[in-house]
Structure formats: C-alpha cells, structure tokens
C-alpha cells in the first residue's frame, strides 16, 4: 500500500475520477500479501482471519487468541462470517482451549459482529464480553485494566480517534501491542477525530512496543516507526492547509481592509492540490480529508470558521 502522502499526490492528477479511485483501491487490495485463515504468529498469539476481505478491511479483520494454556482470551470477533466461527470452534476444540474473556477494541461491526456467534457456541461467554463504553450486558474496560491468562497479560490503553471507545492492548510478555484499527498492517486508517488519534498515537509511542498486532493486515515488526510515519503524514497535511490559509491572508489587498478573507473546503482543495481535480473526487475524497484537518486545527485554536450564506468558510487566526 502507498503512504498517505503518495495517495494524495496520486489523487491530485487531473485524470483521476471516482471510478479510477475505486479501481486503485481494488488494485491495492489485490497486491496485499495473502494471510492464512489461522496462524500461530507467536508463542502466545494465534491469528484467525475474520473472512471478510474488502477495500477497507484489507485481508479481513484480524482476531487474536492469546495465551499459552488451556484458558485463553480472544481479541475482537470479526464481522459475523459463518466461516470465521467455524474456524474458531475447530481451533478451540482441537487444541482443548477454553475462552475466558472476549475483548473488543471498539464498536465497529467488523470487530464486534461475531460476538453473538461466540455466545451461541459458548454460552459461558455471555458474561465475559468486555468493551469500553459497553453495550447492555457487556462489561466495561477502563484505561490501565489488565487481563491475565496462562502465559499472557494484556493491559488496556484507551486510545480514541478511530472511534471514541477505541482500546489498544499491550501484551506485556512480548513488549507488543494489539493496535486495533489505530494502526493497520498496510496503509493508513480512517479517522473519526484527528486531534484525539494523534494524541493516541503519541501515547502509543510512549509504550515503546516493538511489535504490533493490527486489526487489519500483516504483523507490524517496527511499531514505533509505523506510528511515527502516520503522525508525520498528518502533520504534513496540517502544514499544507496552514500554508494555503496563509496564502489567502497574504492576498488580502487594501480594498479588503477590515474584512476577513475566508474560503470553503472546495476552494481549499484547489489551493492545496491544484486545479483540474475531478469534482466528485474533490467532494468525496479530498474535501473530507481537509475538513478533518481543519476541525483539528480549529480545536487547537489555530483556525476559525464563519457561516456565510449557509456555508462554512475557514480562515486563519492572527497567530498563524
């Protein structure tokens, strides 16, 4: 997968359109390395693929069975694929494993969709489902909470941004981290709120974990490097937006004295990416990226917005 900055450069081509972007995603999916349905990827971790491959789930959701003894825990449950629960049941029965805890990284359906099938197959798990901001009949996970089974202890980190309830889990014995959807094995993740996820990435860095077990994609061997890359990409985009806003302020002539110059996201796309962008690509792809950045900068007090004729327009504050 290309980096976010490379994708942004690719999307700036005047020949790009929505179909081409979809084709790009499909091509990138085909280039992903295949992952086995079930694989022992460390002495303490077995990965079971969720059987839900797609443009945004990559090879499928990774679910992890953690521990070395008879009693183990599972992190995430896939999307509810019948093949996933069949693979999980076969694995547990063949290895004599009993699940003690079901830990969910966040609420999205491709991570929680298999909960009902797990409970149907193993009714004792009805009271063993754990998630931050839990649904009814689930148990809460709080920041710093630990879960232990034979051979493994995982410690929860509240890391919002991809989702408000997102949790990562540090596997203490391996100095590794289950990163959920905050960091993927390929490419970059979708963001609910940019400011919180950047703070979460910085917090994840302080754990100094060597290995990452992501919610989607292959094993991450240098986790801090991957996190640092993601942070740098977002900071670069912030700088592009700020440079563009400085540009419009610099163009303010004497006739605009005392009046504020502001622009809408569509105009900002042109300033950042140039003219000739397909309108659908601008609306569906580029504008949401820039709005995400603008909201973060507004929360930081660096930019502001005003409503003009029902339209939100953005401007730099004087400290920019």
From Swiss-Prot:
Pathway it works in: Secondary metabolite biosynthesis
Pfam families documented for this protein: Lactamase_B
Record flagged with keyword NAD: no
Keywords linked to the UniProt accession: Hydrolase, Metal-binding, Zinc
Record CDD domains: LACTB2-like_MBL-fold
Gene Ontology BP terms: secondary metabolite biosynthetic process
Chain residues that bind Zn(2+) 1: 106, 108
Expression induction or repression: The expression of the dibenzodioxocinones biosynthesis cluster is positively regulated by the transcription factor dibT.
The keyword Zinc appears for this protein: yes
Cofactor requirement: Zn(2+)
Family indicated by similarity: Belongs to the metallo-beta-lactamase superfamily.
Protein name: Lactamase-like protein GME11357
């Amino acid at each position: 997968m290309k980096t976010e900055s490379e994708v942004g450069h690719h999307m700036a081509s005047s020949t790009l359109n929505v179909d081409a972007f979809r084709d790009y995603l499909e091509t990138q999916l085909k280039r992903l390395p295949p992952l086995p349905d079930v694989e022992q990827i460390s002495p303490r971790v077995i990965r079971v693929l969720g059987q839900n491959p797609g443009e945004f789930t990559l090879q499928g959701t990774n679910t992890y069975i953690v521990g070395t003894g008879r009693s183990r825990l599972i992190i995430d449950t896939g999307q509810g694929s019948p093949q996933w629960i069949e693979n999980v049941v076969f694995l547990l029965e063949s290895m004599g494993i009993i699940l003690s805890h079901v830990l969910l990284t966040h609420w999205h359906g491709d991570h929680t969709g298999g909960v009902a099938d797990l409970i149907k197959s193993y009714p004792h798990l009805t009271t063993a489902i754990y998630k931050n901001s839990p649904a009814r009949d689930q148990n809460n996970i709080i920041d710093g909470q630990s879960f232990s089974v034979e051979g493994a202890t995982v410690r929860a980190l509240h890391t919002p941004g991809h989702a408000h309830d997102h949790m990562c889990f540090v596997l203490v014995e391996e100095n590794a981290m289950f990163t959920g959807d905050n960091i993927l094995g390929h490419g970059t993740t979708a963001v609910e709120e940019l400011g919180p996820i950047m703070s979460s990435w910085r917090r994840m860095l302080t754990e100094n974990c060597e290995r990452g077990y992501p919610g989607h994609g292959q094993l991450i061997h240098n986790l801090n490097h991957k996190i640092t890359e993601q942070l740098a990409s977002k900071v670069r985009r912030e700088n592009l937006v700020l440079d563009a806003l400085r540009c419009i302020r610099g163009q303010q002539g004497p006739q605009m004295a005392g009046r504020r110059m502001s622009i809408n996201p569509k105009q900002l796309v042109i300033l950042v990416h140039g003219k000739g962008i397909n309108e659908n690509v601008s609306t569906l792809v580029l504008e949401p990226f820039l709005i995400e950045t603008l909201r973060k900068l507004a929360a930081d007090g660096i930019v502001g917005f005003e409503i003009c004729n029902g339209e939100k327009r953005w401007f730099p504050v004087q400290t920019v």
